[in-house]
A protein has these predicted regions:
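Catalytic-core regions of core metabolic enzymes
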Residues: 1-192
Length: 192
């Protein structure tokens, strides 16, 4: 819903888009129509959206439901978290922008990933685009280059609801063969 942000995203090196759509104020078609189209498009692996508001919440919910059934990730940068931001977004698009907690509930219900800035929107969408298949559980393995990174990774993961399961014995044996003797083969993994 922003021409300038659309141009900024298109200028991102190393990221390929099947479509880059600027809906503007949605005078002819609604943002929900574009999201619905991208959910059904076979060439689109991930739907990344800058969203100010919607006019038809039911249509948006239906698109999110279909994406969840297809296991197609939707990543949203939603404007209007603050009172002032909500008013600005509503005046820009003339759509339902407020009630941010309602959007959060809708995102949670259908597994839509909400991000906080453009960089996070791009990197999250890119991560899902290159994954061979989506994870079925909120578990994660991480490999880091320092003890500091490893500690931060463990903390941030827990804050985000991720768990780092212990490696299977077969994996531990392989890591012991590959890592220097002073390295501890645990998850998250410190490579130093």
């Amino acid at each position: 819903q922003s021409g300038q942000l659309c141009l900024s995203l298109m200028d991102s090196p190393g990221i390929r888009f099947s479509y880059s759509i600027s809906a503007g104020n949605c005078a002819v078609t609604e943002m929900e129509d574009y999201i619905s189209f991208l959910v059904d498009d076979e060439d689109t692996k991930v739907v990344a959206v800058y969203l100010e508001g919607v006019r038809n919440p039911r249509k948006l919910s239906d698109a999110f439901r279909r994406a969840a059934l297809k296991r197609k990730p939707i990543v949203v940068l939603k404007a209007g978290r603050s009172e002032k931001g909500g008013k600005l977004a509503a005046s820009h698009t003339g759509s339902l922008a407020g009630a941010d907690k309602i959007f959060d509930a809708l995102f949670d219900k259908f597994g839509v990933i909400r991000v906080n800035d453009l960089e996070e929107l791009l990197y999250t969408a890119q991560m899902f685009a290159v994954l061979p298949k989506l994870p079925t559980l909120p578990t994660f393995a991480s490999m880091n280059l320092s003890g500091g990174e490893t500690g931060i990774c463990a903390d941030v993961g827990e804050l985000c609801g991720l768990s780092y399961p212990d490696f299977e014995e077969e994996t531990l044996e392989k890591l012991r063969e590959l890592l220097p003797g002073y390295a501890s083969p645990a998850n998250p993994l410190d490579m130093t």
